[in-house]
A protein has these predicted regions:
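TPR/TPR-like (Sel1-like) alpha-helical repeat modules
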Residues: 172-176
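Single conserved hydrophobic/aromatic residue that forms the stacking wall/gate
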Residues: 179-188
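Short coil/linker segments at helix-helix boundaries
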Residues: 82-115, 119
Length: 188
């Protein structure tokens, strides 16, 4: 069945236009709340990692690593939808989005700077890297993060930061993990 998806981008175009007063059909009220809801669940896994009793320690580490990567990814999306772009000159002072690290739903968080948000995202990426071990998933679990996802996200974040060498290095790690055939690249 073919459907008309012409309105699928309305949500993002309304954010871009800052059209809060007369939203069109398909525009979500408080669209940012969806992302913070996902962050809440990721924080719940991270905060309760010592209480997880099912599965091996390797499985638990993988799950917690995925929660860190998911939290970083949600902050990254929020920063790019609702914050200013990363610039080396403006990042330390320019306000972006609030970083959510815990489960407290009552606290009203102040906005963090662009630099603080990107530092938090990179911290979550490194936390995920230290815990995750699954290089690839079988098709039924293809929606889950893997070690390749960690490097892919790092590469994307570093590209947005203008750190070209670090972005290239992260992308190169993906290449080296995926392809074991001889290559002009040094994957050692």
């Amino acid at each position: 069945m073919v459907t008309d998806n012409s309105n699928s981008q309305n949500f993002y175009s309304e954010i871009e236009k800052w059209n809060d007063m007369s939203p069109k059909d398909g525009t979500r009220e408080f669209g940012w709340a969806v992302y913070y809801s996902v962050i809440y669940y990721a924080n719940a896994i991270i905060a309760n990692k010592d209480n997880i009793k099912e599965g091996s320690q390797e499985d638990i580490d993988q799950l917690v690593g995925e929660a860190y990567l998911l939290r970083g990814y949600m902050h990254f999306i929020l920063a790019n939808l609702y914050g200013q772009p990363y610039t080396k000159e403006g990042a330390p002072e320019t306000k972006s989005i609030p970083i959510k690290w815990d489960l407290d739903l009552e606290v009203v968080l102040p906005r963090n700077t662009v630099k603080e948000v990107y530092t938090a995202i990179l911290s979550d990426i490194e936390s995920a890297r230290g815990l995750m071990h699954q290089k690839e998933w079988e098709a039924v679990y293809a929606y889950r993060f893997s070690t390749l996802s960690v490097d892919a996200m790092e590469s994307r974040v570093r590209l947005y930061m203008g750190n070209w060498k670090e972005a290239y290095d992260a992308a190169e790690r993906i290449f080296c993990l995926l392809y074991t055939s001889p290559s002009p690249r040094d994957c050692s």
